[in-house]
């Protein structure tokens, strides 16, 4: 789990640096691979869609965002299925894992800790538990899409100068930036449904980094990028709720584990109050 968190944090920080620190002139014509095969096709597609919606580039960006999300939806569903499968295995292995973790806390020497950690790895192997199997591919795929959106908007005077609702697509908008951040914060809480309190604590930092990064970047990036995030986040939240409903019905042991964790936390809280 720690290795996966490091990978995700690296990806998010990479996106932050790229979107806030790139110095390439977006108006400059380039014949590079990224420009030729990603930026220019994105720009052309947005303009193509805009022709069918009365030249409204805001609606064109929304449609493009939904199409992108629909295209990567099978990959997201596969990832969600893997996550639910991992949660199911963790629920079954939980009694053994809890017992080993308790002994690990009582261990007094490094040799004893190493021996107990080997036992933990044996349990993981026994139940075929590997958090890295859940993967980060959906997030990695979105990186070039974000960059293409960014430069397509800044490189097109038609898109950059277009006003949609109350904001200009080519300029930052604080209200939309906050909306995009809140949408992804809500999406994070939706994604935590079904996880045990202990797992939620482990994933809290990486989970909150995404909305914080989106909020930070949206304050300085073209508002069209915040629009992409807001629409994409709403789509992703709905998709997550759907997959949770579908897969959690197939893995009732996850609900049992979550209920047991909640009951345990309530007992701990009551004991603290009594003291």
UniProtKB/Swiss-Prot annotation:
Keywords: Cell membrane, Chaperone, Lipoprotein, Membrane, Palmitate, Protein transport, Signal, Transmembrane, Transmembrane helix, Transport. It comes from the Bacteria. The chain crosses the membrane at residues 48-68, 133-153, 174-194, 212-232. The keyword Plastid does not apply. GO terms for biological process: protein insertion into membrane; protein transport. InterPro entries: YidC/ALB3/OXA1/COX18, YidC/Oxa/ALB_C, YidC/YidC1/YidC2_Firmicutes, YidC_ALB_C. It is found in: Cell membrane. One of its GO terms (cellular component) is plasma membrane. Its main location: membrane. Residues 1-21 form the signal peptide. One of its GO terms (molecular function) is membrane insertase activity. A lipid is attached at residue 22 (N-palmitoyl cysteine). Pfam families: 60KD_IMP (PF02096). The keyword NADP does not apply. A lipid is attached at residue 22 (S-diacylglycerol cysteine). It is a multi-pass membrane protein. Belongs to the OXA1/ALB3/YidC family. Type 2 subfamily. Required for the insertion and/or proper folding and/or complex formation of integral membrane proteins into the membrane. Involved in integration of membrane proteins that insert both dependently and independently of the Sec translocase complex, as well as at least some lipoproteins. This is Membrane protein insertase YidC 1. It comes from Listeria monocytogenes serovar 1/2a (strain ATCC BAA-679 / EGD-e).
């Amino acid at each position: 789990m720690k290795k996966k968190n490091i990978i995700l944090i690296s990806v998010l920080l990479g996106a932050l640096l790229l979107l806030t620190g790139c110095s390439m002139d977006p108006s400059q014509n380039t014949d590079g691979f990224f420009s030729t095969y990603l930026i220019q096709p994105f720009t052309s597609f947005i303009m193509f869609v805009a022709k069918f919606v009365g030249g409204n580039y805001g609606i064109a960006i929304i449609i493009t965002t939904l199409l992108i999300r629909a295209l990567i939806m099978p990959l997201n569903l596969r990832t969600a299925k893997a996550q639910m499968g991992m949660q199911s295995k963790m629920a079954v292995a939980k009694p053994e894992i809890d017992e080993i973790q308790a002994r690990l806390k009582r261990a007094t020497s490094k040799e004893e800790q190493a021996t107990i950690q080997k036992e933990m790895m044996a349990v993981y192997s026994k139940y075929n538990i590997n958090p890295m199997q859940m993967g980060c591919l959906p997030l990695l795929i979105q990186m070039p899409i974000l960059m293409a959106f960014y430069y397509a908007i800044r490189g097109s005077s038609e898109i950059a100068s277009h006003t949609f609702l109350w904001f200009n697509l080519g300029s930052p908008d604080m209200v939309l930036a906050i909306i995009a951040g809140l949408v992804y914060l809500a999406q994070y809480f939706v994604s935590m449904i079904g996880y045990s309190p202990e797992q939620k604590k482990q994933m809290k930092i990486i989970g909150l980094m995404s909305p914080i990064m989106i909020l930070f970047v949206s304050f300085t990036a073209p508002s069209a990028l915040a629009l992409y995030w807001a629409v994409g986040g709403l789509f992703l939240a709905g998709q997550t709720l759907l997959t949770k409903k579908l897969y959690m019905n197939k893995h009732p042991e996850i609900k049992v584990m979550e209920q047991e964790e909640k009951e345990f936390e309530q007992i701990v809280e009551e004991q603290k109050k009594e003291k």
